Amino acid sequence: MMLDPINHHFQAHEEAYYSRFFNEQRGLHMIKVLPGGVYVSDQEELICTGLGSCVSACIWDPVKRVGGMNHFLLPFHNHFEEKHWHADELLSGASRYGSYAMEMLLNQLLSLGARRERLRMKLFGGAQMMGFHSMIGEKNVEFVLHYAEQEGLEVVAYDLGGLEPRKIMFDPLTGKAWLKRIPFAEINHLRREEERYAHTLEKQTDNDSEVELF
């Protein structure tokens, strides 16, 4: 979704959840989606993100030529809750937050004229990063695959799980995606970014009423 740069509320949203820069080599604007963010576009630009334990859904309508990406992590209050959670627990706080992250992306696509029956999806992320919530990547993968199946969304490609973080680049008009494994030297920065996001979620999800299930 293209946001009005004059509107200060949207400026604050951009600073918090995504950043925009011009890639001279490709001659295109690129939008980096940060943890907790959603970005949708019908413009000639590329959407990118870095993923450790988080997951991203890249969804597009090939007829309308509109697409978008989210970047999220399921919130768990403790290791016991994380270990025993399953994707069919639809009313749990983690499932409701995950559904909210997916519906935010879907609703913004539909608002730009996409048709739900035409939507295609590619899924990335969910790595098991050492020293960071040992099962969180696995649970994120379980959730997003279960959600796609339950909602009847066509998953045409995915690269999920494993041990290596990823960099993703996505063309919202064509659905083409590029994946690159993140070198070990960059892992600590990504881990810190996701840990800050997870800590923020722990505070926000103490009151589940703040998350609406569509």
UniProtKB/Swiss-Prot annotation:
InterPro entries: CheD-like_sf (IPR038592), Chemorcpt_Glu_NH3ase_CheD (IPR005659), Cytotoxic_necrot_fac-like_cat (IPR011324). It is an enzyme of class 3 (hydrolase). The keyword Hydrolase applies. The keyword Hydrolase applies. Keywords: Chemotaxis, Hydrolase. One of its GO terms (biological process) is chemotaxis. One of its GO terms (molecular function) is protein-glutamine glutaminase activity. It catalyses: L-glutaminyl-[protein] + H2O = L-glutamyl-[protein] + NH4(+). Its EC number is 3.5.1.44. CDD domains: CheD. PANTHER family: CHEMORECEPTOR GLUTAMINE DEAMIDASE CHED-RELATED. Probably deamidates glutamine residues to glutamate on methyl-accepting chemotaxis receptors (MCPs), playing an important role in chemotaxis. Belongs to the CheD family. This is Probable chemoreceptor glutamine deamidase CheD.
